[in-house]
Every structure is written in structure tokens, then in C-alpha cells.
């Protein structure tokens, strides 16, 4: 077998090692004259095997911050780390700015400014958005029963025609006597009650002007026949309403002023305590017409009176 001299082909490991040595030489030669990204043109110190590591260097140029550090690997090789940061200015509220100036304590007493991973966990920011539903508010306003009574004038003062009771009128001591004097001059009577339709005439005195005794058979109305009260009572039951949640200070006159604007009233019954004479909290109002009673229920039910909300409903017919 013939033998001859020939060049052996180098292995792949030898090629990589030779290329690495060439790269190190070229890199060390080029870094000597290349300026830093921050504009620093000072030459880089040479990293010799026996020399100590240079101290870290920090350079700030505008909003760019460059930090240069040197470290040694386990095999004794030295290398340089260059980190570049962009400085951002963020606006914070006064409360956040004051908290950042607080002095740290405990395990973080000697930590630099900013959060420490060992003691602080920084989570994602959660943005809260407060939404007010105007539609729900509009629905609540529409369902409010008090809004239905805003355009209605339920109570009218007899003295100043205001929206309050006559007994609580601020002008009753001044305008009241003046109206009485004017009514007397015009020939009007303010003391007599207004006669309602269907109301009977008051019974005259038993004695005549001469002072003689008049027997009952000869008095006014003796020739008239008595009328049955059953039909009238049934009509009253059909147009009677029941008012509850009244205050203890309520009187018949207050109920008369409250329900008179809705129609003619035939009778009012206010339940009272026998010993104290105060109201028990409910009353019955009878109208001459059922339509007036229906308007009174729609207008007064839910109305605020003497710091209480009145409840008005149809009265149950009597079984007697």
C-alpha cells in the first residue's frame, strides 16, 4: 500500500479555539478608541489578570443613564457589563409623593430607594372606573309617589291661600282679624259653617219669640214624614275611605281641611282614646260622591302629614 506525506485536516474544536482567540484580540483593540454611548470618550481600562477590578461607573447624560460594572467568572476571566437605562419622569399625587419620602423600617431599613424583591411584591395596577347609571335614577324618580303630588295643590290656607294649614298660617294673627272685620262690613258671616248639599236645616228653638211653649206637634217639620236612613247609609258606605297612620294630635278640623278640596264631605269619624282624647291613628271619611272619594285616595295616599306618611284606602262596608 503506498504511503505519502499529506497535511492533516484540523479538528472542529481547534478551529473554534483559534477563532475565539482572534475575536478577543480584535475586541480588546477596538474598545480602546470607541466612545461610550453617553458621550464619554475616556479610554477603557485594560483588564489584566493580576490587576483588581475597576469600581462601577455611572454616567447620566440627559434622560439616558449608563452603568458600567466589571466582574470575574469562576475560571478567572474578567468581563465588563454595560447597562443603559432611560429615565422617565412620572407625575404622582401628593399622597403618593409623601409616602415615597417615608423612612424605611424593619427588614428594609437599609434598603435603597425603590421596592425590594425580598420584602415587597409589586402587582399589576388596577384601574377603577366609577359608572353611575342615570337610567336607574330616572326610574326611581318616576316610581316615587311624592312626585305625583308636586303639581297638585291639596292644602290651601283660608287666610293667605298658601300651601299650608290655616292653623299654621304665619299671617293668622294679622290677616285673620282684618278679614273678619271686612266680612262683617260686607254683611257676610264667617262664623257659620258652609251648608253642604243634602244637609238638613238646624232645628229652631222650642220657644217662639213671645216666649210661649210650642208643643212638638205644632213645631216646624212636625207635618213632614220621617225618612229612612238605610239608603243614605248604604251610599255613605260606598263613598267611605279609611285613613291610617295619623298622628296623635290630629283633629276633625284637620281632616276637614285635608279632604275638603276633593269634594263634599258628609261625615268624618276620628277614632279617639276615651281617657286621653288623643287620636288612635285612623279615621273614616264619607263623601257624597264616590268619584270624590276616589280622587281623595289618589291624592292623599302616600302624602306626608305631621312627619308621617298617610295611607288611604277604601273602607270595608259594614255588615250591620
From Swiss-Prot:
GO terms for molecular function: RNA binding; translation initiation factor activity. Phosphorylated. Phosphorylation is enhanced upon serum stimulation. Pfam families: eIF3g, RRM_1. InterPro entries: eIF3_g, eIF3g_N, eIF3G_RRM, Nucleotide-bd_a/b_plait_sf, RBD_domain_sf, RRM_dom. The modification Phosphothreonine is found at residues 38, 41. PROSITE patterns: RRM. Residues 239-317 form the RRM domain. Residues 221-233 have a biased composition (Basic and acidic residues). One of its GO terms (cellular component) is eukaryotic translation initiation factor 3 complex. SUPFAM superfamilies: RNA-binding domain, RBD. Keywords: Cytoplasm, Initiation factor, Nucleus, Phosphoprotein, Protein biosynthesis, RNA-binding. GO terms for biological process: formation of cytoplasmic translation initiation complex; translational initiation; viral translational termination-reinitiation. CDD domains: eIF3G, RRM_eIF3G_like. Signal peptide: none annotated. The modification Phosphoserine is found at residues 8, 11, 42, 189, 223, 264. The keyword Ribonucleoprotein does not apply. RNA-binding component of the eukaryotic translation initiation factor 3 (eIF-3) complex, which is required for several steps in the initiation of protein synthesis. The eIF-3 complex associates with the 40S ribosome and facilitates the recruitment of eIF-1, eIF-1A, eIF-2:GTP:methionyl-tRNAi and eIF-5 to form the 43S pre-initiation complex (43S PIC). The eIF-3 complex stimulates mRNA recruitment to the 43S PIC and scanning of the mRNA for AUG recognition. Component of the eukaryotic translation initiation factor 3 (eIF-3) complex, which is composed of 13 subunits: EIF3A, EIF3B, EIF3C, EIF3D, EIF3E, EIF3F, EIF3G, EIF3H, EIF3I, EIF3J, EIF3K, EIF3L and EIF3M. The eIF-3 complex appears to include 3 stable modules: module A is composed of EIF3A, EIF3B, EIF3G and EIF3I; module B is composed of EIF3F, EIF3H, and EIF3M; and module C is composed of EIF3C, EIF3D, EIF3E, EIF3K and EIF3L. EIF3C of module C binds EIF3B of module A and EIF3H of module B, thereby linking the three modules. EIF3J is a labile subunit that binds to the eIF-3 complex via EIF3B. Belongs to the eIF-3 subunit G family. This is Eukaryotic translation initiation factor 3 subunit G. It comes from Mus musculus (Mouse). The lineage of its organism: Eukaryota, Metazoa, Chordata, Craniata, Vertebrata. The gene is Eif3g.
Amino acid at each position: 500500500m503506498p504511503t505519502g506525506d499529506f497535511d492533516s485536516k484540523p479538528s472542529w474544536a481547534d478551529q473554534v479555539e483559534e477563532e475565539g482567540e482572534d475575536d478577543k484580540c480584535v475586541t480588546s483593540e477596538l474598545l480602546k478608541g470607541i466612545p461610550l454611548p453617553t458621550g464619554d470618550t475616556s479610554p477603557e481600562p485594560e483588564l489584566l489578570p493580576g490587576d483588581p477590578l475597576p469600581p462601577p461607573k455611572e454616567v447620566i447624560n440627559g434622560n439616558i443613564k449608563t452603568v458600567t460594572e466589571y466582574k470575574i467568572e469562576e475560571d478567572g476571566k474578567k468581563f465588563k457589563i454595560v447597562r443603559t437605562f432611560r429615565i422617565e419622569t412620572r407625575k404622582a399625587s401628593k399622597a403618593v409623593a409623601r409616602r415615597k419620602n417615608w423612612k424605611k423600617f424593619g427588614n428594609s431599613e437599609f434598603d435603597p430607594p425603590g421596592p425590594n424583591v425580598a420584602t415587597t411584591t409589586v402587582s399589576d395596577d388596577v384601574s377603577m372606573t366609577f359608572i353611575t347609571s342615570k337610567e336607574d335614577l330616572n326610574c326611581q324618580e318616576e316610581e316615587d309617589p311624592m312626585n305625583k303630588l308636586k303639581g297638585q295643590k291639596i292644602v290651601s290656607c283660608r287666610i293667605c291661600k298658601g300651601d299650608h294649614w290655616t292653623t299654621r298660617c304665619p299671617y293668622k294673627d294679622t290677616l285673620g282679624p282684618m278679614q273678619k272685620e271686612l266680612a262683617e262690613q260686607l254683611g257676610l258671616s264667617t262664623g257659620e259653617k258652609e251648608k253642604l248639599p243634602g244637609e238638613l236645616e238646624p232645628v229652631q228653638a222650642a220657644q217662639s219669640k213671645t216666649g210661649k211653649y210650642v208643643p212638638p206637634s205644632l213645631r216646624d217639620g212636625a207635618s213632614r214624614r220621617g225618612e229612612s236612613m238605610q239608603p243614605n247609609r248604604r251610599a255613605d258606605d260606598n263613598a267611605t275611605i279609611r285613613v291610617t297612620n295619623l298622628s296623635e294630635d290630629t283633629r276633625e278640623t284637620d281632616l276637614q281641611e285635608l279632604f275638603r278640596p276633593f269634594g263634599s264631605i258628609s261625615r268624618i269619624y276620628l277614632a279617639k282614646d276615651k281617657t286621653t282624647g288623643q287620636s288612635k291613628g285612623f279615621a273614616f271619611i264619607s263623601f257624597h260622591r264616590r268619584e270624590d272619594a276616589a280622587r281623595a285616595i289618589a291624592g292623599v295616599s302616600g302624602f306626608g302629614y305631621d312627619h308621617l306618611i298617610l295611607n288611604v284606602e277604601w273602607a270595608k262596608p259594614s255588615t250591620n
